[in-house]
Amino acid sequence: QKLYSDKFGSENVKMIQDSGKVNPKDLDSKYAYIQVTHVVPYFEEKELQERKTDFERTHNIRRFMFEMPFTQGGKRQGGVEEQCKRRTILTAIHCFPYVKKRIPVMYQHHTDLNPIEVAIDEMSKKVAELRQLCSSAEVDMIKLQLKLQGSVSVQVNAGPLAYARAFLDDTNTKRYPDNKVKLLKEVFRQFVEACGHALGVNERLIKEDQLEYQEEMKANYREMAKELSEIMHEQV
């Protein structure tokens, strides 16, 4: 902002705080507008397998991603059964880091995810994060415990069980394509396995003062697995 304020005068520069799509017709031509949004590196599955270290995942990157939540009713946020999101993948002309701080975007690709696809995506991320934390050469115990705590929560309206109730419960599955329901079930199987493995890793690392905390998480895990088994009609 300072760069362009110095160039055009601060009274002529306006920041757009919303990272959504901007209609040029809504803008006043006498102002220079700057829109800033947070992006994260974007990798395909194959790339993730090749880029194993933190260094490899933060260097020589030219594709970035940001997501915008929306609902068909026009609201930004809604319940899990109505929450959609638009994913935008940006490809820059050069890889970061670069000799310049700003690099033009060569092209952008948009994908809209419907509610069950959002659930599949969010649960797949949880599985990948747990697996990555457990496979690190030096396990970050604080990060692992935070991730576990959020994963084995059995709250009614939050966490993984909210997705299971919304999309895998008998009264709801018929509303969604069979292939998406099957995929979400498979992701949940992987999720339960990843949580169990993460609990085992955590148990090996903790000291005596955290034994009670570990037992509490294990109890939550068993309760979550039990409820998932009832929803999915199979032992997970």
Give each language-model segment a name.
Residues K2-V236:
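Eukaryotic intrinsically disordered, low-complexity segments enriched for acidic and Ser/Thr/Pro residues
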